[in-house]
Amino acid sequence: MIGGLFIYNHKGEVLISRVYRDDIGRNAVDAFRVNVIHARQQVRSPVTNIARTSFFHVKRSNIWLAAVTKQNVNAAMVFEFLYKMCDVMAAYFGKISEENIKNNFVLIYELLDEILDFGYPQNSETGALKTFITQQGIKSQTKEEQSQITSQVTGQIGWRREGIKYRRNELFLDVLESVNLLMSPQGQVLSAHVSGRVVMKSYLSGMPECKFGMNDKIVIEKQGKGTADETSKRCLRQESCGKQSIAIDDCTFHQCVRLSKFDSERSISFIPPDGEFELMRYRTTKDIILPFRVIPLVREVGRTKLEVKVVIKSNFKPSLLAQKIEVRIPTPLNTSGVQVICMKGKAKYKASENAIVWKIKRMAGMKESQISAEIELLPTNDKKKWARPPISMNFEVPFAPSGLKVRYLKVFEPKLNYSDHDVIKWVRYIGRSGIYETRC
Amino acid sequence: MTDSKYFTTTKKGEIFELKAELNSDKKEKKKEAVKKVIASMTVGKDVSALFPDVVNCMQTDNLELKKLVYLYLMNYAKSQPDMAIMAVNTFVKDCEDPNPLIRALAVRTMGCIRVDKITEYLCEPLRKCLKDEDPYVRKTAAVCVAKLHDINAQLVEDQGFLDTLKDLISDSNPMVVANAVAALSEIAESHPSSNLLDLNPQSINKLLTALNECTEWGQIFILDCLANYMPKDDREAQSICERVTPRLSHANSAVVLSAVKVLMKFMEMLSKDLDYYGTLLKKLAPPLVTLLSAEPELQYVALRNINLIVQKRPEILKHEMKVFFVKYNDPIYVKLEKLDIMIRLASQANIAQVLAELKEYATEVDVDFVRKAVRAIGRCAIKVEQSAERCVSTLLDLIQTKVNYVVQEAIVVIKDIFRKYPNKYESVIATLCENLDSLDEPEARAAMIWIVGEYAERIDNADELLESFLEGFHDESTQVQLQLLTAIVKLFLKKPTETQELVQQVLSLATQDSDNPDLRDRGYIYWRLLSTDPVAAKEVVLAEKPLISEETDLIEPTLLDELICYIGTLASVYHKPPSAFVEGGRGVVHKSLPPRTASSESAESPETAPTGAPPGEQPDVIPAQGDLLGDLLNLDLGPPVSGPPLATSSVQMGAVDLLGGGLDSLMGDEPEGIGGTNFVAPPTAAVPANLGAPIGSGLSDLFDLTSGVGTLSGSYVAPKAVWLPAMKAKGLEISGTFTRQVGSISMDLQLTNKALQVMTDFAIQFNRNSFGLAPAAPLQVHAPLSPNQTVEISLPLSTVGSVMKMEPLNNLQVAVKNNIDVFYFSTLYPLHILFVEDGKMDRQMFLATWKDIPNENEAQFQIRDCPLNAEAASSKLQSSNIFTVAKRNVEGQDMLYQSLKLTNGIWVLAELRIQPGNPSCTDLELSLKCRAPEVSQHVYQAYETILKN
C-alpha cells in the first residue's frame, strides 16, 4: 500500500510530508527531489523506481504530489487516489497552489489522516468529509449527530447525508461534450471521437431516487420491441426530433449509480449527492457531427517564404451560433515576419507561441471563412526539417456533437411530499473542442 | 489568518521560544505553538527536543489540537520511546470516549506508534474497538490489526486478532468488510502458506455482495482479493465473472482494471466454445478503450496493462487500432507506449493506416520517439509481409531526410528486413552505402557492415568499404568488431582472389591484438576453418540463416501469465514480477493463471495462490545462484591446454577431447587451397570447450545413444521429473532421469522449448560432485530447437570427473547453456546408478569384511509395505547390481546377505531380513555396513526404490 505522501513546490521544497509505513525513510523525500524534480531530463514516466522504492507523481500547476511505496501496490489506485486528493483539497480551499497549501497545512494533515489509513484509501467524498473535518475545532455534537456522521462515512450511501431540505426542489443537467478529431491534409478523418460528461447539480430534499434516460440505441431498440402501436408512435416522435438514437461505445458512472442494474437492464438509477457531481462519462465514435472543417494549404516559396491559406467551414444548423472560435496555425521556429489577411475576426502572429492565432467571436452554421498569411523565414543551416505540427482549433457550440439527447430524469422521494412534477429541471448542451486537429 | 507564516520562522533560539509557548496557559497560544512545531517537522527540522512539552498538550478537548499532537507523536515516538509511554493513558482513555470519532482517532494513532511498550497497551483497546457498536470504529480497528501485525506479527497471532478480523468479513457494514479484506490480504501475503483468507464459495458470495455496496476503494480491495481465488469449476468461474462485469462501467479506473484482472484470470477456465466466452471478450474492449480518456498518468498505467492484455488475448482489441494513434500533445511516456501497442495490433487489414501514422511520427521532435517510430516501420515490414515493399520505400524516404539518427535507425531495421526477405530488396543497397560516413552509432555501423558482408558479391567496392572500417578497428565497439570480422571472412569466401590481405589483416587484429575473448575465439575458429577446410568454412560461414521471427520482443509466456495475475499493480507497469522490485518476503508469492478446465468435477480445494509447477517431484532449484556461479566458474575443464591444441588428445572432458580430436583429424588433411593460399595455424590457441557447435556436429552420430539402446535391461529407471521449469530458464524446460545400462551411466534428458524463439548452441556442464560424475560427451542437439519442440537426448556420463563432497551426498549441480543464457539447477541422482557390475563379493571375504567393519558403522532401516519373497527381492536387486552372497533361514525369517560396490570402489554390505510366512508383516529390515557410513542412507533409498518398483 501507499507508504507515504509528499507535496513539493516547484523548487522541490517539501510542503507536506506524511509517512504511513515504517519502510519509508526520511531519505525518500530527498530521493524524489533529486531524481525527479531536479532531474535535468524531461520526465519520462509518472512512475519512477529509485533504489527499490517506487514513486508515483502528478503535477498540479507547479505543485508536485508524490506517493511512495516499497510494495507491489495497485498502481491505478494510487493515481486515482492522488487525483481524488487534489479534488478534495480543491473543494476545501480552491486552487492548488503553494500559498494555499501552506495556508492550510494543518487541514491537509487532518485530511490525510482521515482519507488514508496505513496507506489504504478510505472514504474520500467531500460531501461526507465536510460534515466532520471542519477546521472549527470540536463542535458540541449531539450523540445523534455523531452516529449520523459515522454511519454516513462508512455507509452504503456515503456521498449524501440525511435530512437535506430545500424550499424549491431544482436540478440542472449539463451535457458537456468534447469532440476530438484528427484529420489528414486531404480531409480524411483519421480518428474522431466524442468524450462526454453528464454533470448534475441537484438541490433536492430528502433521499431522492432518480432515474436518468437518454437516447441510448440499446434502450430504444429494446423498448421498440414492445407493442407495434407504441413503436409506430415512437418512430413518429423520433422523426420529428430529427436525430435518432445514438450508439454509445462505453460509459462509466459516478459511484452512486447502481452498476448491476445498469448491467442487467441498462437503466441508470441512483440517489444523487447534494450539489454538483459528474453523473456519467461516455464515449461515442459513430455518426459524430463535426462542427467545423479546416482546409489547409501550405506552400513553400523558396527557402525563405511560406504561404499559408486556411479555410474553415461550419457544419451545423444555420440557426445555431458557435462561440469562442480560435484557429491556431503553427509557424516555423525561424519565422522572421508574418503578414495576415482575414475576412472575419482577428488574427495575430504570436512569436512566443510560434503560431498565428485567429480568433472569431461568433459564427453561425453553414458559413465559411478564410485566412491567408505570408510567412518570412530566416535562412538557417539547420538540417532538420520543420516538423509541421497540425493546425488546431477551439470552439464552443450549443449542441451535443454526439447527438445525445436527455429523454427524462425522474425523481421519486416517497417519504417527503413532493413529486416528480414539482421538481424544476434544466437541461443544457455544450459541445467543446477537445483535440481538434488537422494536419497540414 | 493564514498558516503559512509558520513556515517562515527560522531564527535562533526558536526551540526555546516554542517551549515557552507550549507551556503557555492560553489555549490559542498553545495551538499556535503546536502548529509551528508541525511546520518545522514538515520541512525536516528536528523538533524532538520538545517532546514532553507537546505531549503535555495532548489532554485537550480541542480535536484539532489533539490531532496535531498525535501527528507529532507518530513522528517522534520511536526516537523517544520512554517519553511516549506518557501518552498511553490518554490513548486508553480516548478509546473509551463516547464520541466514536475520538475512539477511532485514538486506535488509529496508537497503531502508528511503533514502540514495543505501547503496543502491549494497545491490545485491550483494540480488542474492544474491533467489536465496537459503531462501524466507523470497527473499520479503523480492522486496519489497526494490519498495523500491529507489521510491528509484531507474533503478538497479533497470540492475541487471536486474526480470527476477529476474519469474522469482520461477515460484518453488516460494507466498509468494515472492505478494510478487513484489505488487512487480511496484506497479512496473508507475508504468510504465503497460511490459509488466512480461506476463500470458499460462501465467503466469495459475501464479498461479491459487499462489492455492490462499498466505496470505490473498497471495491478495489475486494476485487484484488477475488483475483486470488481459484474457482472450483468453469461454472463457478462464469458466475463470478457475471457478477464482476458491471464494475467495468465504474468511473474509477482502478476499479475497472481490477475487474479486468479478475475476468482475464477466470476466463482461462472458460471453454472457448461457450457463448459466454465470446460475450465476455466483447465486453472487455470498450472499458479498456475508455481508460485512454483518463488523465495521462492513468493512461500510462492502462497502456502498460493493455500491452500485456494484447499479448495474451489479441482478439480483444484487434479492431481498436485507431484509439492508439498518438496525439500531438500526449506526454512522451504515453506516446511511446501507444506506439508499442500499435505495432502489436498491426495486421494486413490496418497496415496502410498504421504506416501513414508512423511516417508522420518519424518527423516529430522527440528523438526517442522518432527512433521508435522508425523501428516500428521495420517491425511492420517483418510482421505483415504484404506491406514490406511499402515499408522499405517509406524507410528510403526517411533516409533521404538525412537526419542523422533517423538514417541510422532506418539502416538497423533494413538489416532485419534483409534477413526476413533475403534477395528481395538489394536495390536499396546503393542508397544505404551513400550514408556510410554519417553512421556513428555502433548498432548502425554493425548493421551496415553486416549488409556489406552479406551482399559482398553485388557491391563492387565492398572490399574498399570494409577496409575503411578496418582502419580504426581497435576504437570500434565489440559489436562492430565482431561484425567486421565476420563480414570480411564472408567477403573472402566470396571473392577469394582480391581479398587475401584483408582477411589476414583482420584475423591477426582479432586474434593477436585484441584482448576480448569473444573476438579472439571467433577469430581463431575462422582462421582454423579457413586453413583446414575452406569448403567446410564456406558451409559454416555462408550457411543459410534461419529466418528471424516475427515477434522478437514478446514477453516470455510464463512471465506473461504471471503478469496477467498482477494487472493494475506496479508489476504490470514495470513488466517485471514483484520479486524483482519488492524487498524481502512480501508480495513475492508466485501467481499463475488457473488451468483451463472442461467442467471438471474434481473436489480438490485449490490453494489461494496456486504454484505454477506441477505437484510432486520437483528438483531443488539452487537458491543462491551467486555461490554456484562462482563454483562453476572454477570448474576444471580438464587439464589446462598448453601449446597448440594438436597435442591435446587424452583429456577427460568430452568436449575438449572432441574438439581437439576433431580438429586434429581435420588438420591432417591437405588444405584444399584457394588460389594456393597457405594459412599458418594460429600460434597459440586456447580453444573454449563449449563453443564447437558447428565443428563438432560431424561427429555427433557417435554419441547418439538415444535411439537403439532403450530400456532393454539394466537397473531401475525412475520416470522423468522436471528438473528445470521453463519459468526459471527463459522458456527452456528440462526434465530427465538417470539410467545405468551394461556398465554405462547416462543422463536421459528431455529438452522442451517453451519460449517463442529458436534455441541453439546447447552445452552442459556439471559442478564437482561426490562421485565425480561428468559428461562423457558434449550435449548433442542436432537441429535448433524450435518453439514447442521437444527433443530427447541421452547424455553418457563418466565417473572420472573431479570430486567434491556434496550435501546431500547425491546432489548434482548442473549448468546448461544455450544461445539465450546459462541456467543452473541441481538434482539428486539415485545411488544405484553407481552400483558396478562386479560388485559380488565371495563368501569368505564377505564374512571377514563384515566383522572387520566396526559396529558403529552399521545402519538399520525398515522398508515398509513390501510384500516380496526372498527370490523375488533377490532377482530384483540383482538387476540393479546388488548381489546376493548368501541366504539363510533363521526362525522362519529369510536372511539375505548382499554386497555391492560403488564406482569409486566403496563396498557396501547388507543384511536383508524378510518374513515371508507372515502376511501381516510386510516390512523388510535392512542392515547396512560400510566403511563410509555416509552412503548408507542413500543405499537404503536405492533399495527402497528398486524393491518398490
UniProtKB/Swiss-Prot annotation, chain B:
Per the record, a Pfam family? Alpha_adaptinC2
| Organism for this UniProt entry | Homo sapiens (Human)
Q: Where in the cell is it found?
A: Golgi apparatus; Cytoplasmic vesicle, Clathrin-coated vesicle membrane
Q: In which tissues is it expressed?
A: Widely expressed.
Q: Where is this region: Disordered?
A: 584-625
The annotated subunit structure for this chain is: Adaptor protein complex 1 (AP-1) is a heterotetramer composed of two large adaptins (gamma-type subunit AP1G1 and beta-type subunit AP1B1), a medium adaptin (mu-type subunit AP1M1 or AP1M2) and a small adaptin (sigma-type subunit AP1S1 or AP1S2 or AP1S3).
How the protein sits in the membrane? Peripheral membrane protein
- Biological process according to GO: basolateral protein secretion; determination of left/right symmetry; heart development; intracellular protein transport; kidney development; melanosome assembly; platelet dense granule organization; vesicle-mediated transport
Question: What keywords sit in the KW lines?
Answer: Acetylation, Cytoplasmic vesicle, Deafness, Disease variant, Golgi apparatus, Ichthyosis, Membrane, Nitration, Protein transport, Transport
InterPro entries of this UniProt entry? Answer: AP_beta, AP_complex_bsu_1_2_4, ARM-like, ARM-type_fold, Armadillo, B-adaptin_app_sub_C, Clathrin/coatomer_adapt-like_N, Clathrin_a/b/g-adaptin_app_Ig
Sites of N6-acetyllysine modification: 318
Predominantly, its location class is: Golgi
Q: What does this protein do?
A: Subunit of clathrin-associated adaptor protein complex 1 that plays a role in protein sorting in the late-Golgi/trans-Golgi network (TGN) and/or endosomes. The AP complexes mediate both the recruitment of clathrin to membranes and the recognition of sorting signals within the cytosolic tails of transmembrane cargo molecules.
PANTHER family in the cross-refs: ADAPTOR COMPLEX SUBUNIT BETA FAMILY MEMBER
Residue numbers bearing the 3'-nitrotyrosine modification: 574
Where composition is biased (Low complexity), the residues are: 594-611
MF terms from GO for this chain are:
clathrin binding; protein kinase binding
Looking at the record, which disorder is this protein connected with? Keratitis-ichthyosis-deafness syndrome, autosomal recessive: An autosomal recessive form of keratitis-ichthyosis-deafness syndrome, a disease characterized by the association of hyperkeratotic skin lesions with vascularizing keratitis and profound sensorineural hearing loss. KIDAR patients manifest ichthyosis, failure to thrive and developmental delay in childhood, thrombocytopenia, photophobia, and progressive hearing loss. Low plasma copper and ceruloplasmin levels have been reported in some patients.
Q: Per the record, GO CC terms? A: AP-1 adaptor complex; cytoplasmic vesicle membrane; cytosol; early endosome; Golgi apparatus; Golgi membrane; intracellular membrane-bounded organelle; lysosomal membrane
| Protein name per Swiss-Prot or TrEMBL | AP-1 complex subunit beta-1
Which family does the entry's similarity section mention? Belongs to the adaptor complexes large subunit family.
